[in-house]
């Protein structure tokens, strides 16, 4: 009798640990740290976590949970969005690193992206005037993947201005 109870308790403990690990890899600090590393690399000050922006991001991510569509919210904040395919445990750092990887395609001198490339996610990450971020992550329904969004205040990517 004791063995099945012990096995069930052990299984529940392992499941709880896995949930905590997943949440631990998507904490506010897991978003803030890679943002600040990228910003520090170009001499820009740190961003801090905003619960207001987090709530906005979570509300929008919840709206994308059924389709996981890479579509911007149209909200009043700067915004980066990320989609990861089903079957992988996409984390906060995966999204931020994806955006920061666009640095190689950004030319500061001309304030443009390389031909045929995207770099606006990177420039939003390092936008000097942006001082607060809030992010959210959802696992989309029907095996559609993971949707991650970060919002920025003040918003960046203002035409004609350099990010730093």
Swiss-Prot record:
Origin: domain of life: Eukaryota
UniProt signal peptide: 1-24
Keywords, sorted A to Z: Disulfide bond, Pathogenesis-related protein, Plant defense, Pyrrolidone carboxylic acid, Signal
Disulfide bonds: 68-140, 113-119, 135-150
GO CC annotation: extracellular region
Entry's family note: Belongs to the CRISP family.
Name of the protein in question: Pathogenesis-related protein 1
Species whose genome carries this gene: Hordeum vulgare (Barley)
